[in-house]
Amino acid sequence: EHLGGEPDVIWASPDCTTYSIAAIYHHRTKEEDGNLAPKSEKAAIADIVTQKTLEIISWFPNAIYFIENPRGGMRKMKFIQDYPRYTVTYCTYGDDRMKPTDLWTNHPNPNFKPMCKPGASCHISAPRGSTTGTQGLKNAIERSKIPVNLCEHVVKISEEICN
């Protein structure tokens, strides 16, 4: 009721810190079924917030939703397994970083660009531990930026359904 109606589109970017490949073993323990149990308070809070995000999305069954998180541990979580997932690479949307990123969406035909391959010329090489790519960016705001072309694509495909 605070919104003045229901949203047509929902975009969610839950905190990736405890799901990231770089910090996953600091925050999580792999269970027998593949789920990643929290072992830090930060990870437990991240799971609560992410699950609340999914609950809020469920309040609006007619909305198109997109949930974004860099490819990593979130895709292993039990609570996200029933959501359709796609993986994009930021370089295919004009960024100089490859940054494989998972997008969960109920859009019937999101038509995301195919992922590029490691070593392709469309992105800067960023081997683990290097100072290039996302890991070379100094602040969270810069590391979290979503390419404009990907945002424009999401707007376009959402408008096709909502209009």
Residue map of PLM features:
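Conserved active-site and SAM-binding loop architecture
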Residues: 1-163
